[in-house]
Amino acid sequence: MAVLLALFAFVQPSPAGRLTAVISGKITDGQGFPLAGAYLYLASPAQLGIRNFITSESGRYGFPDVTPGSYKITIELPGFKTVKVEGVVLSPGGTALINFKMERTEIEEEAVRLESGQGLDRTTGRLAAVIDRDLLTHIPMPRDFSSLLGLVPGAVFDNNVPSVSVSFHGAPVTSNAFVEDDVNVTDQVNRTPMPRIDVDLVDQVVVETAGLPVDRGPQQGAFINVIRRSGANDFDGSLAFYYTGAGLSKSLWSPQEIGSNNPAAPRVDRSNLDLAFTAGGPLAVDLGWFFSNVRFTSRSQSTPFESWRDPTNVFHSPYNWKDTDFAGMFKVSVKPMRNLLGRVEVNLSNIHEPVYQPDVAWNRPLESTRDLTGQTFFLAKVGALYTMDQGTFVDASAGYVHQTQPLPLNPGGASKPSYFDTGTGRIWGSGPYNDQEGRKGFQSNVTITHLQDKLLGVSHELVAGGDFETGKATSSVWKADDLFMNYFNGSPYTFGLAVSPHSASLVGLGRIGFSNIPGSSLAPMLTTRDIKRLGAFVEDTLNFGNRATLSLGLRFDHADTTLKPVSKGAVGNETALSVGETVVKPAAGFNPFGGAAFGQRDNVINWNSLSPRFGLNFDLFGTGKTFLRGSYSLLPEDPALAYTKNLDPVSADRIHNFYWYDENGDGKVDVNDTYVAFPENYNAYFTSLYNKRIDPYLRAPKVNEWTVGLDHELMPDFSLCVRYISRSENGVIGDVMFDPATNTPWYTVQGSPAGRWVPFTTTVPASIAYPATEVTVYFPSTGAPAAFDRIQKVPELDRKYRGLEFSFRKRMSHNWQLFGSIVWSRSTGTAGLASPLAMGLASPVLTPNSFVNISSGSRTDMDRPLSIRVMGTVRFKWDIFLSAYYRFTSGAAWARSVTITPPADWALENGADPAPVTVFLESPGSRRHSSTQSTDLRLEKDFKRNGRTRWTAYIDVLNLFGDKSEIVDYNDGSWFPDGPGGSTGTHVLSGTYGQAVFLSGTRTVAFSLKLRF
């Protein structure tokens, strides 16, 4: 009788971000001697055709590049009983190591043994969450990809709201890579996916959060691998309908509760319609498949904005948000010959939002929003897999992506200035600017994998490959009026009354700014940024006696960014042009608000990096049930294009600030008023100084990451995993004050020449919630060099993450499934709340105030000490399914902050610039917002005919128990001390002090019906 000696899975690093797996092992007789000439067949509904292998004298076999799915393995050899193993489940990027022992026989018979595949990816290095089709089918959640990411252990959403801006195990939200069917769809500027990922197209999602294999590019975050559905030998189609809306979705906050807070009501669905059609099947049985999808969604929500009259006496009414999305995909897989598999797919989408979703806020009226007028996305991919021999294959692919994103201003405010009240937090007038964004990307990769037996006494999986990628980001920006005007509690005079340096009269003193955005669409600000990457990698995964595997990998990357020539017309505000001529030009030598052109800048960021990556997997007891795992990686940062945006010679986001003395007292900014420039970086416009904007010796920062853990198969299909994750990074990139004349930074007191910074100590008075607090802030001296900033590594910026992850997975069998995790973690460092640039975004320049009450022990903005996620499904009689999904997350860390404006006479006497500064009054993490939790439920029923499901109906109840949370504004507002060392002065709290500025809590009931044919 044939005996299956061992079945256990080592999920090992995979080449080229491949979407496939490997099956390998050894065939022996009853005495353990290898068997040559054994014939293996590998079959699955997920695979085109049947693959085969003939063993050599070593008895070893291997099937590289196997499509994920459930497989049947058959082994035949004359004189031996035939062996069949069914239900071997393979996850993307995995290697299943399966050894067989065959028994001799004199008659033809079969020994059949059913075995389940692994319950959890057992990897030599990577820590990965696999969200398979069973989870995708039954999880109760909104039909969007961001909600799906919330199931991944260690995930923390930016602002605690499900989105694609997400951190995994302490990594920056901008450090993830989003990949669809081997095509990188990550926006090179903001580092989020360019398309909306359609959950109807998803077959599996693999999120690798630590221990990344060498084929994963230069990144420090998660590798989010979305595997789309493919066709099959049997035709299958579906028509799905999903709806929720008014009466089915409601706020859990009463009008009285909302009325007592700031207008921050949670958004509620007015209507949410989702229609999807899919069809897939054979072009020719075992030779070619196709899969197609068309999807239309229409969604409308209320917004938290309530009726309001702005300080210029304009009334603003409530408004709703609406979105429509049309998308389509077509995919073909062909196998024209036994050893060649080809793939082609195209994908397109079009999105329209009359109100751009990121602009929706309680403090922003309709006139201050933008219109997403038809965002288009296109993806095309070709790929081929060529099997050279039984143990060697070559995988090559190429992909192209293109996105356009037009964002015109709302017509109601397009010609107005932009207004912001620093006291109340209110916004009105024009939105940011009219913008036409574009993205293009091309990528190609090739990988060679070879399974080698008995090399130096052990078996090897040898991987070598390379990848090439180009990215382009374009922007065309203009705005009729470039004035940015600050109010304070309804008054245009931010600093009250002051003596004008021109007229010597007591007049209103305000803070205003002008951007350098052109005033006409005929001469917009045109910027183009390019990036090129070239990578190469090698890896050897050694198998020691089927008991341990060791992977040794090394990756090299070269990245180069370029700024194409930039041009712009003059701004549209006449006062800005006048101020530029009379105030800025005499000091700086030019008018930043006039027309300008700048030449191309090559090699803006040009760095090479080496990334060693190692992994270990050891079968503790030799049973294939318990594995000790560990990994070590040195992960370089991906430069992307975010840094180059911060280095643009002209930037749509750059605003030059001025003290505004309202000479005629009309409350309006005009040419007859007096203006004094803030000390800002006008040197950035000079080509001769441009190269000093970035450290010429800048190299890619690297994260030191190591993990250690244990996997245990508790029972068939049920696995447990414990993993400890350590990540640390020192010398994070920041933007610092820099003196180009002496080539020295001066962003800290200790590292600056004497007299550069003037200290000012004051005591911020007690408020309703907090005691009085003493703080020392720093103002630049009037004798300091002209403002200039440089991007460089900052020794004072660091981040550290320590986490313990416990996860469990019960695959869908015996009518139930379970997936969950508990993560205890601590995320600390100065690179977080202290330095947004360290998160890959444009940031304020670092000064000594950036480190007030900030230390390496401060909690970062992504710190969540405890997060719990559990999702399960039970199948009852009559094909009724009940699924529940629970999640809990600790509240975000925060700390009190205050904006301090020193007395004018003190500033004059001490030679200090009195521009306001904002600092923390305590270390971040001293306080936390409230934790959040929610429970979702789904009840569904399959209706079958002739043994096949024809209809599926379900109802979702999201936030079943009505959980809700709030964020209350208890910041200390603005402090105008009478002098140094005391606690007297004017303390102005924000207009929302003690009120909720964010409310979370809705309950939604949704219905869905799916017809299959």
Regions found by a protein language model. Name each.
Residues 721-894:
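Gram-negative outer-membrane beta-barrel transporters
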Residues 717, 730-731, 735, 826, ...:
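C-terminal beta-signal and adjacent terminal beta-strands/loops
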Residues 267-353, 372-395, 555, 612:
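Transmembrane beta-barrel wall of Gram-negative outer-membrane proteins
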Residues 10-124, 198:
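Periplasm-facing N-terminal accessory domains of Gram-negative outer-membrane beta-barrel systems
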Residues 80-106, 110-230, 258-268, 272-281, ...:
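Periplasmic N-terminal accessory/gating domains of Gram-negative outer-membrane beta-barrel systems
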